[in-house]
Amino acid sequence: MTHRNALLAIHLGALMFGLSGVLGKLAESSPLTISFGRALFAVLALLIASYLLQPSGARPNWRSRLGLLMGGLLLGGHWVTFFIAVKVAGVGIATLGFASFPAFTVLLEGLLFRERTRPIEYGLVLLVCVGLGLVTPGFDLASEATVGLLWAVLSGFLFALLALLNRAVTRGIDAVQAALWQNLAILIALAPFAWVGVAGMPALDWLWIGMLGVFCTGLAHSLFVASLRVLKARTTSVIFALEPVYGIAFAWLLFAEQPTLRMLAGGTLIILATIASSRLKSTPAPAAEPARSVS
């Protein structure tokens, strides 16, 4: 893959990840059912990808698989809470609330890995908090915007935990295999609760959820992994910071969810903090990139 093709691939992957909220809103099913269906189609897509793509690392051993299954539970929780936010507050607020996860990552790295947090990183956390304050018109638990934002922030917190767990358990492991095991964990964990919803799922929902699993998870993740073989991790991180931009743009076009000036200002602060956070990572870990399975 050439450098130009890798850039196209990573932008296409970010675009697909940005469509997750849009497809989740189009589907009439519950967030639990949507997440189960997404995992089902993602497992099928990742199985195909594992045969077509050259492995980027080793196959996970049983100890690693246990960690990946735990990561799958976090990923499943992240998906469910994200789609709840989409249903309650809309795609824009849900996407921007989730985009707060770098702030949680900064704080949790200091607590869990005892890494020194620099003053500028605390500044980025403050920037995200100000951005979140601007995204919602006012903090009122009777407001759907506020409730949806809280669900989205919880989704971002769970994703931050997932990112840190992946950092510990995916060293040297093929990224597609890691994503496959995590989606398999979601499939198994949600099956007892989502089966009734799947049985009564509207026919059109199969299309939206199938696209979520195949394109916004399986294919998007495969493009991400393939591009990492050519691009620097920092470059891909900055490009993936555009995910909320794509999500808000599609929601505006398809659902007339026109963002307010406050929301645009808050979103700009959150995205800037995300980009700055990725640029501040001084030394990349000497391991394979962790599985990237975003909303």
Would you name each region that the model predicts?
Residues 39, 137, 205, 215, ...:
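C-terminal-most transmembrane helix of multi-pass membrane proteins
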Residues 7, 94-100, 165-185, 217-253:
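Helix-helix packing/entry segments at the starts of transmembrane helices
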